[in-house]
Amino acid sequence: MFKYGFALIAAPLALTASLPATAQQSPADGLSKISNHLRSMSTMTANFSQTDRGGQLLTGTLTIKQPGKIRFQYQKDANLLIVGDGKALTLIDYEVNQVQRWPISNSPLAALLNPERDLSKYGKIIPTRNPDVLSVEVRDPKRPEYGVITMVFTKRPGAPGALKLDGWVSLDSKNNRTSIRLSNQKFGVPVANSTFNWTDPRRKSRSKR
């Protein structure tokens, strides 16, 4: 099960069509709007569907609390959990009682979870045919091993920065592609810090020996 989560956090979005773009705002303006959204968003909850390169579909609920906290609560039969505590991302596989952990800054998700990150240095607006859609590709050219993330936003009055995150695609250095689609997004909802706690399966495994 590890491989399904690894591509998501160690790493051209189907949410937008690769057709000729209509007249749109400048790339700098687009990056500014996205940065404003990420800085304005205190919390977000959503349902998600995740598809990997092999076509396997997993679903669950996503919770974000800025800065840096995130939780992917997968469907029960997946036995998988991904949690970010503000500093590190942890992938817990309850099926095999394994845990992996690494800095958020080493993941494509840093673009989403670090609202102070300068997108003008790492981001590039990807043209779309819909003027209400913004797509940004974020990568660190000095750290290709961190992968690439392409996020898609749509205009939504009343949302933070008047934008709504619709999903993203992450691509790691081994070309493993993971697509996330979001629905039922809610902003500014109360989220306790305990939401980002998790149970270490290795303790239970050791106690059985």
What are these model-derived regions, one by one?
Residues 23-42:
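Short N-terminal segments immediately surrounding and downstream of signal-peptide cleavage
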Residues 61-113, 178:
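An acidic-aromatic
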Residues 36-54:
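A short, Trp-centered hydrophobic/proline-enriched beta-strand micro-motif
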Residues 41-43, 57-59, 65-67, 77, ...:
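Extracytoplasmic
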Residues 120-122, 127-209:
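Gly/Pro-enriched, hydrophobic low-complexity segments
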Residues 1-9:
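Bacterial N-terminal signal peptides that target proteins for export
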Residues 52-54, 95, 174:
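Solvent-exposed strand-loop boundary residues in beta-sheet-rich modules
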